[in-house]
A protein has these predicted regions:
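Asp-based, Mg2+/Mn2+-dependent phosphohydrolase catalytic module
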Residues: 2-23, 31-33, 63-76, 83-338
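Receiver (REC) domain active-site loop signature in two-component systems and cognate sites
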Residues: 27
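Catalytic-core regions built around general acid/base machinery
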Residues: 37-47, 152, 156
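Generic structural signal for secondary-structure transition and capping sites
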Residues: 47-48, 194
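Short internal beta-strands
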Residues: 49-53, 164-166
């Protein structure tokens, strides 16, 4: 990728328009055990809450992991879908005796030990079996989730427990590629019970609202790599959004998506000035500006072409995106679209 040492690349001015960033983690800030290029530079010194659908780690564990990768983060800067699931579950349960929400309720947790701890902290009594007739099943991602746990969850849900999933992401980005996400295992319980869970995480708007209030933000920007969760959730919350091309969603998916981000970028740092696009009949012609790393050029080409294609899609028209005649940089950028 182009680095700031390249004279062509400049820091994003997009981020300066906002007073807080609500930032996804997997695929946006890091992939597995490695930081995404540009993320540390882009986020440095900015008010941020890390809003993650990953429920397998506690806020403290997430903060420690980010710190080990060179980010300046406290546990208070992290909002996980496990936290959101506990809050949602408490609000769904009927505490007709007037007790504090969740205080007298029982929960069966499919997920990490940290999720069980968060449920306990939220006032739930965590049980180990469907035979104890839990009031709610809380389902979050953990590498330790197995057939026995999913079966207990299915038994509890069939017996009437409220079913709350931390998130419905079907895949989880890693350095090796896309792994099975929480939504894929939730689908097994849904198949066995016929019950669709309440989902606490993205793409619902709740997490974004909580994160913005946490910072007292008036102009928050939702940032992520997935259209169907990060961008859809930000849109649902009524916020501007930035889709970075460092994770799941690719250029061609963004070009024809129903979840249209306000901004598109290669990463949280690098930007190339001067790229333009214009419509000529049924063609969008991209002209290059400043040149640099091909991934950054590809993102700039998409950023200027996408609004024209979206408008055409709304009119029922089909446009083809091409490089301007003789523009080798634009041609290279479009060839890199995935």
């Amino acid at each position: 990728m182009t680095s700031l040492s390249s004279p062509a690349a400049t820091p994003h001015r997009i981020l300066d328009r906002y007073d807080a960033l609500l930032v996804d983690l997997d695929g946006t800030v890091f992939r597995g055990g490695a930081p995404v290029d540009g993320a540390r530079d882009g986020l440095s010194g900015r008010a941020s809450v890390y809003v993650t659908n990953n429920a397998s780690r506690s806020p403290q564990q997430v903060a420690e992991h980010l710190t080990s990768l060179g980010f300046e983060v406290d546990a208070a800067d992290v909002l996980t879908s496990a936290q959101a699931a506990c809050t949602l579950a408490a609000s769904l349960l009927d505490n007709s005796d007037g007790s504090e929400q969740g205080t007298r309720s029982t929960a069966y947790v499919v997920g990490a030990a940290s999720f069980r701890g968060l449920a306990t902290d939220a006032g739930f009594r965590v049980v180990d079996s469907a035979d104890e007739r839990p009031d709610v099943v809380l389902h979050g991602h953990s590498p330790e989730n197995n057939w026995a746990m999913l079966s207990e969850a299915a038994l509890a849900v069939r017996a009437g427990a409220v079913y709350v999933a931390s998130n419905l992401d079907t895949t989880l980005p890693s350095e090796r590629g896309l792994l099975i996400g929480n939504g894929s295992l939730v689908a097994a319980v849904v198949s066995a019970t016929g019950v669709t869970p309440h989902s606490a995480g993205k793409p619902g708007p709740a997490m974004f609202g909580v994160a913005a209030r946490q910072l007292g933000a008036e102009r928050p920007l939702a940032v992520g790599d997935r259209l169907d969760t990060d961008i859809a959730g930000g849109i649902a919350a009524g916020m501007d959004t930035l889709c970075v091309l460092t994770g799941v969603s690719g250029h061609r998916e963004i070009l024809h998506t129903m979840w249209r981000p306000t901004w598109i970028a290669a990463n949280l740092r690098d930007h190339l000035e001067g790229w333009t696009a214009r419509q000529d009949g049924d063609t969008v012609i991209v002209e290059s500006g400043a040149t640099g790393g091909v991934d950054v050029m590809a993102a700039e080409a998409l950023a200027v072409a996408a609004p024209l294609v979206w408008s055409a899609d709304d009119r029922g028209e089909d446009l083809t995106v091409v490089a301007a005649s003789g523009d080798s940089a634009a041609a290279e950028a479009l060839a890199a679209w995935r």
